[in-house]
């Protein structure tokens, strides 16, 4: 209730038996209380908006820095950046801002560590956002099927600045570097590469690309990709796989993320992630790897 401070102040003024002056003082005190509460509300929503804007901005800055670190930005890099913008529903001015951020990240002296520290401070207590950010960068790094030494170095910097332990990050890398995973990413990169030439302008000269994206071929998940999604090994037992599934669903289920006041764009990403987790678990069950 927006005016409870004034009502409370008025009530206290009445019961104080000081007459009209008591009621006036009570109203004034209540007004100050209401203003303080309104200010805190505005600060909270401003912080939420700032955090989400910073998340998107840093995502594409780091993405540009990561892809440029290997010498040049490839068509596969442009492809994955475009797909990320689509997944985040960044269109119009938001898309142009993301493309500018991508170009900023490609600059030779881009202050990556400083930007990452700002993001970590803004996401304090929100490891779900940190993990989402890291997953995006990993997908970008492995999109062409080969992890360049410079990309690996940048990924270590990202993990370090975001507070991800070396052990956790090495496990993520092992899953991404599996032979089956590399082959599937190479195949997808070859299939999508030809369709991306006309998209490059938005990332190189500041203009948005035109034309419609051709439909991507449907690719079913494999046991290997399902294991990567759940963060397990094919040799893990049913209990371990089920525990990993439940943990991931607890982190990414949209119903639980509603209380965290994520933006609609992030909620959509969480929904898709939950669907991927569910599909991976069902695939492993159907493959008789779980009971």
Swiss-Prot record:
Residues 177-223 are annotated as: Disordered. It comes from the Bacteria. The chain crosses the membrane at residues 7-31. Residues 181-211 have a biased composition (Low complexity). Its main location: membrane. Pfam families: DnaJ, TerB. InterPro entries: DjlA (IPR023749), DjlA_DnaK_co-chaperone (IPR050817), DjlA_N (IPR007791), DnaJ_domain (IPR001623), J_dom_sf (IPR036869), TerB-like (IPR029024). SMART domains: DnaJ. It is found in: Cell inner membrane. SUPFAM superfamilies: Chaperone J-domain, TerB-like. Residues 32-291 are cytoplasmic. The transmembrane domain is a dimerization domain. Regulatory DnaK co-chaperone. Direct interaction between DnaK and DjlA is needed for the induction of the wcaABCDE operon, involved in the synthesis of a colanic acid polysaccharide capsule, possibly through activation of the RcsB/RcsC phosphotransfer signaling pathway. The colanic acid capsule may help the bacterium survive conditions outside the host. Homodimer. This is Co-chaperone protein DjlA. It comes from Pectobacterium atrosepticum (strain SCRI 1043 / ATCC BAA-672).
